From Swiss-Prot:
The gene is rlmN. This is Dual-specificity RNA methyltransferase RlmN. Keywords: 4Fe-4S, Cytoplasm, Disulfide bond, Iron, Iron-sulfur, Metal-binding, Methyltransferase, rRNA processing, S-adenosyl-L-methionine, Transferase, tRNA processing. The keyword Transmembrane does not apply. Residues 348-371 are annotated as: Disordered. It is found in: Cytoplasm. S-adenosyl-L-methionine binds at G169, E170, S201, S224, L225, H226, N300. One of its GO terms (molecular function) is tRNA (adenine(37)-C2)-methyltransferase activity. GO terms for cellular component: cytoplasm. Binds 1 [4Fe-4S] cluster. The cluster is coordinated with 3 cysteines and an exchangeable S-adenosyl-L-methionine. The keyword rRNA processing applies. Disulfide bonds join C112-C343. [4Fe-4S] cluster binds at C119, C123, C126. Residues 348-363 have a biased composition (Polar residues).
Amino acid sequence: MKNLLDYTLSELEAILSPKFRAKQIYEWIYKKNAENFDEMLNLPKDMRTNLAQEFYFDPLYCVKFEESSDGSIKYLFALKDGNTIESVLLPMKEVEVDEGGNISRHARYTICVSSQVGCKMGCLFCLTAKGGLKRNLSPGEIVGQILWIKKTNHIPYERRVNVVYMGMGEPLDNLANVAKAIQILKEPDGLAISPRRQTVSTSGLGAQIKKLGEMDLGVLLAISLHAVTNELRSKLMPVNKAYNIEAVMDAVRGFPIDMRKRVMFEYLVIRGMNDSVKDAKTLVKLLHGIKAKVNLIYFNPHEGSEYGRPELADMLEFQEYLRAHGVTCTIRQSKGLDISAACGQLKQRSQNLSPSNNNTSKPSDIKKSES
């Protein structure tokens, strides 16, 4: 059987007759949260039967989750082949001011999705890398994470959702499928998530950054930098031996970005390694001429990690130096400190799970992880 979520609307129109049925199916899946083909009552019964024999649109289900006191939720999903991946829901508040000056606050959601089962980049601070790469996710398996999280958290269709390709795996190592997922997600008759609300995060595959730019998808770009010298970055991130800092910066300078947007540089701050004012000075020089925003991230220690969480004073001093020298800089609000927040943690803690391939779980059936 084939995963219906792997298909763009135009692809579905090409294989269905009459083709307007494709839009109806898209609306049932992405707007009306249908659980099966039998619910699609405006389709002929024989068509529903045939579709059910050829397609499925439930490529994953949740076998465990952890909910933090700050509202963030981390999910462990099982795929049809028994492999598992992680996704995270980050709820936040968005403040809006209307023409009359009235202030309102609305829920805003960011969903962090995986693009691969495992990862081959080998970053020393990442748990996922320790297991290596098993396989790429299909477009539908990527889309399925967002669909499942939106559905089970009752996020209204019209509510703004941001998507970040920052979970397990290197998105640009699975560029074709990630690009197709971006196209499926932006479909107006589907989830209608604008590319401007989708961010692709990469460890710095220079050639693939160029290819992504040439696709002109309109997405935002985030670079996992984490160090300002090639010596340290090569130690932390072996990919730097193939694409060093200078090569990454060259690729970024050629990436098409909306005039109102900036390239995000993720900088994981590790105590005593990359948290000094000297590092901040070097970073300012590296970013010269780039419309950049730096996001400082507290290292989130995992069991067996040799690295430590930085001090708040050091984070603030680093941030202040960047701001004083014209670089937009934020400190990412730590989420999920009381759960398995680091990439790969929940999966590691759940190695003994034996999920069924039958996607029958409902929100009430999900096993909440005991911290």
